[in-house]
Amino acid sequence: MRILIINTLYHPYKVGGAEVSVQLMAEALARRQHQVLVLCLTPEKQCSNKVINGVAVCYVPLANCYWPFDGEKKSFFQKVRWHLKDYYNVDMRSTAMEVIRTFLPDLVHTNNIAGFSVSVWSAAKACGVKILHTSRDYYLFHHNAALFHRGQNQDPESIRIRLLCWLKKRCSRLVDGYVGISRFIFELHRKAGFFPNARHSFIYNTVPAVECAGGGCLVKEDVRRIGFIGKFSAEKGFDDFCTLARHYRNRSGYAFYAAGRITQDNPLIKEARDSGVTLLGFISLEDFMRQVDVVVLPVKWHEPFGRVVVESIFHGKVVLTNRMGGVAELAALLPNIYFMEEISVDEVVKRLAEPLCPDILAHFTPDRIAQEYEQAYHNVLNDRFGA
């Protein structure tokens, strides 16, 4: 099968877990003898092509007023101009059509489409190619993709959100198949009226198993190393992590570490340092896991999936988090996940991680996820329709 996968970013560009999930999915499909082309954005001015781990990748310039992934602060008017164009980016539609007509895919699989905009669905339809879309964030509801604003989760049924997503919802009628990366995000889009003509399902993200020895054992029994990894932001709960660190700052036996991108204009960086958090910077997941015993993720937004939760469990860690979005589903599948409303840090650091059985690991293997997407592709191509 010839599959064109569209995602905002692809290796080496990365801002979160979606890029990792899309890359693992693309590589698994390529190993299963599909011809896969990934279409993604680049900050460069020219198109370029690479082959990464057996997957062909086409990088195209973003046709908008700035590159939004460089961490640089933009003015209010720059942001307004960018987002207005991103509601339906005609230039990116033309770019997508050119790639589709050259590659001639059997199916276009869209994922995160900020930058491309929903115009890529129109491009695929104009070329007579069927579309499957996977929601990995809340971009279709709100331009910040998090449905989290000024410290609060936004109501998808509010007048403001319904107005913001009206055009995107209308364009979603063009999509033939829809997948959410958790039951939560799948139901949220379905209940809001997105993808009325599509077959709906949910497929979890790929999370490869890791070799892990004795995850419940502490390197220093007298010091409990508490870790946070991810974006240093309020929706990820990093402010609450800092508050927790401040609370334990003068108590012996606790050390707090945080891994993520450090930007000096982020007020939470100073808050972290003042609270006694050791900032590790942007390091690999493996390096982070070697330096912590318990992972604390006080997420406030509705995590579409919760990739870091699964990765932490697979590295033999106990996770303390909040019951938000897809994380609640993961707790029903995986051991060693505890919720902050039910247990304290003092208690959770005493828990040893339970071993993982093969059946648990099988839920997230690249081959299994690729098989599930193959079935979703076949359903779309065979014109099956389901509610």
List PLM regions with ranges:
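A conserved mid-protein helix/loop that constitutes part of the nucleotide-sugar donor-binding site
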Residues: V20, F228-H247
